[in-house]
């Protein structure tokens, strides 16, 4: 079962969240990553000069992208995760409007151009309003979170998440004495004997964000390795 594991639970005492609104549809995640693989295959074929292969991968990518949006993109429908709050009629989001559900399509270039602003706005609203300025993604969503927020003009929100010291955050772990990344965002209270005290995947894109966005060091995606910075 594909899912966004290690989503921070709503309580410091819980090991796993019991709130279904925090969990992202596994089918959305799996399909988004299938599309990411198609994009990579298209790029690899192009880099090697395999024109026919590149065109074949690109055609499949475009057809899958249309199917993805037909299935998971919601326009002017649904309800807000904020209790008592009704969505504005122009609200546009993916899946059940979790941060991960919106960040993945944004990061993978799956959102139709005229909807990008609204989808990004919903991701930011979920972070600031629903989650009070804290991380709510698991190991999958967090891999793209900070860089995509910055790319969409919300570097201030990315910085807030990167520097928070209250639960759930990386800073919370540090404040509680962690020298490596815990398996659980609340590993000190939920399960101090958790399986992993060095769960590097939960670091997400914090380090790439520091290199790419804070330091401004980026590799050319159309050149192999780091041949062109």
Where are the regions that the model predicts?
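Active-site core of glycosidic bond-cleaving carbohydrate-active enzymes
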Residues: 3-229
